[in-house]
Amino acid sequence: MAPTTPATHDPALSHGAPPTQGSQAPANAAPNLTPADISGMQLNGLDQSQIMNLLRSLPGMFTGAKIPDQGQGNPKEDAAQTLSNLAQASSPFGGQHLPIHYQTGAAGGLPGINDPGPSTHPRGPPNLGQLSAVAMQAAPATIQHQDQQQSGRQEDGEQAGNTSIDSPSAKDGENGTGEFNQTSTSTPSGGRRGGRSATMGSDEWSRQRKDNHKEVERRRRGNINEGINELGRIVPSGSGEKAKGAILSRAVQYIHHLKENEARNIEKWTLEKLLMDQAMGDLQAQLEEIKRLWEEERMARTRLEAELEVLRNMNGVSTAGAGSGAAKDESAAGTKRRSTDGADAAGTNVEGGNNDNAEGERDGKRQRTE
């Protein structure tokens, strides 16, 4: 049965041939490599001459090893020998392990499926515990850099907050435009401070609480001042006072006055409505009575017209006969009246002649007497 792979071993590197006891050797000890093994290494696609140039450019790294000059001997064997000497030499950094970096490219990256296993790896499998330790050492540096950036932003926010707090506030009796401007000015700094999370109970947390309380109080005062100024513009002012207390007092008096007027108007409107309803009821009763009388008169007239028509039909002939008899009587009476008038006129003439004769005789007798 094959031995199991240890927990610190990379599974991607163990693909291929089964691991051996030699592959589990600690990474601290430099393996005994031959020049042939080192000559088969591929460092990121570099040839042997480039490797030698890189090794020569490193200062203070090869005090105990001799590097052949360029152009002497076989470059391939020289590079392999130099790498073998470096592997066997002690570390110049006091035994501190250097992290192994792999290039994430097509050439020289992490070993794939078709790459050789740990048994043929030139320096043995990488120690994952060592890589984790290196990562943990690099993490505090990143955290420290972030803390420095946060402290810089915090100082900027505190300066902006102090600037907004130190600005002069508006007086209590005047309009609240100054406080409203302070609120709008200090809002961005408060938003930046609120975006950071501080530890509960720390100085930064207490400072944030105080700043938030000041911001809320400033907004509340601004709203109160704005409302009082609006009341001062609405409520009629006899003396023209602009103090907040005077404005509130006048507003209360004006509200009481409006409520009293409303009560009086409601009472008056109710009485007028009752009187109007009563008058409308009386007019409706009179209208109904007039309609009834008119209907009775119309029916009586229709009845009388019908009776008159019946009487005319019944007395039509008798009326015509009575009319002809009356005409005859009138003609006879007229003839008799004319004859009587002629006789009377003749008698009157005779009497007049007789009288004239008598007077003439009396005159003659008087003349003879004289």
Swiss-Prot record:
Residues 208-258 form the bHLH domain. Residues 143-152 have a biased composition (Polar residues). It comes from the Eukaryota. InterPro entries: bHLH_dom, bHLHzip_scCBP1-like, HLH_DNA-bd_sf. Residues 204-218, 359-370 have a biased composition (Basic and acidic residues). PROSITE patterns: BHLH (PS50888). The keyword Lipid biosynthesis does not apply. The keyword Transcription regulation applies. Residues 222-258 are annotated as: Helix-loop-helix motif. GO terms for molecular function: DNA binding; DNA-binding transcription factor activity; protein dimerization activity. It is found in: Nucleus. Keywords: DNA-binding, Nucleus, Transcription, Transcription regulation. Transmembrane segments: none annotated. CDD domains: bHLHzip_scCBP1 (cd11398). Residues 1-39, 102-221, 317-370 are annotated as: Disordered. Transcription factor that may regulate the expression of the gene cluster that mediates the biosynthesis of psilocybin, a psychotropic tryptamine-derived natural product. This is Psilocybin cluster transcription regulator.
